[in-house]
Amino acid sequence: MIMLYDNPNKTSHFKPFEELTITDDFMFGVVMSEPSNLKPLLESILNIKIAQIHYPERQKVIDVTYDAKGVRLDVYCEDEKNTVYSIEMQVTDQRNLPKRIRYYHDMIDLNIIDKGENYKELKKSYVIFICCFDPFGTGRYMYTFKRQCQEEPGIFLGDETESIILNVNGSVGNINSELRSTLAYMSGKTPDDGYTKTLDKAVKKVKENEKWRRDYMTFAMKMKESNEVAVLSNIISSIKRVRDKFTEQDMLLIFGLSSEQLSAILETIDANPDMDEWEIANIILFR
């Protein structure tokens, strides 16, 4: 195992547990793991009535889910019509929302196909991001995306996928009063209706729970590890591209690595030619 950073806390920027709000990934996941909290939110976003929702993998609702590309932090549920919903908070603009949305839709479909279902059985799906920023800069509360013909705008593909991005600081567009109050609460304002007061009480209840405090520490540790893997996998990708063009001494300067770190990376690359950067980074950091 090698240390990627001289200061092991360099990638740790997690709030103290007591300071968490509904917009923090962990708190959002815990609060929304209760159907009575999540169902009204989905109903207000989509302007529909949902009879009931359930979580296919209940134990993973607020877990940090690792996959080949990193970490998923979404709340995943289905309703009585087998419609799938993936909803996530996004506090900072990482400028990757379109690709992240595409990836989530793909994962929803692959999860069904991996179980042996025919593609005709693919479920209607919504991927929803609630953002503490305006990704498109128009001031809208909501941006809704469906696949549509460019030549004939009135023709929709009808693949039953829909993507929605919400802006908690929005002021443009017509949304229902319930959703407006919810977005205002998520932007930091005082809860002003029954639902937001329920959410606020749920947040306070989580903070009083020692189990959730311990789980948050585990969550923070896993996120720190994932961040380190992401950084190192990018370095490994770059090293693979340039190692034939530069000396090892040059690469030490280019990538800001120690001799031990660079040697470990090169040795692991050579020993595992079939592994991708993410797998190699995990070996280097945690072997």
Regions found by a protein language model. Give the residues of each.
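Short, charged alpha-helical interaction segments and adjacent helix-coil junctions
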Residues: 2-18, 26, 85-90, 177-287
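Accessory alpha/beta interaction modules
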Residues: 1-162, 172-174, 225, 287
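C-terminal regulatory or interaction extensions
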Residues: 169-171, 198
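Amphipathic alpha-helical segments in well-ordered regions
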Residues: 41, 45, 49, 169, ...
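Hydrophobic residues at beta-strand termini and immediately following loops
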Residues: 166
